[in-house]
Amino acid sequence: MSYWLCITNRDNWKVVKEKNVWGVPRRHENTMKRVKPGDKLVFYVKQESRKGEVLEPMIVGIFEVVSEPYSDSTKIFKSHTPGETYPIRVKIRPIKIGEVKFKPLIPKLSFIKNKKKWSGHLMGKAMREIPEEDYKLIESLL
């Protein structure tokens, strides 16, 4: 079993929860091909500004993968890139939903090597594998 940190925004987090599906752009297909049924997905929502308010980055849920990756271009996710549908998808089921602030976790997460420039470990990625010890820490706090 593998553990993955899935990086999204609040709009698409709502879609994930409602539809029990996770999707990534085609350029991340090689990463998604490594995802297997039984793997755990930890969802991270990025820091965002909404109406002048800064919404902190958070861990918001853990899901289990229940399908092999598949392709579906049905537009369910929001994207800033015209025509992007996040077509490489897996079906998932919820394990835990909650909110844990991400910044206080940074010193404790082993996959983040550079604690000062931590966002570099997440930028440009849709998802990344994380060690079991980091998964267990996050799960215990959610």
Curated annotation (Swiss-Prot):
A Pfam family reported for this protein in Swiss-Prot or TrEMBL: EVE
Family (UniProt): Belongs to the UPF0310 family.
Protein's recorded name: UPF0310 protein PYRAB08750
Taxonomic placement: Archaea, Methanobacteriati, Methanobacteriota, Thermococci, Thermococcales
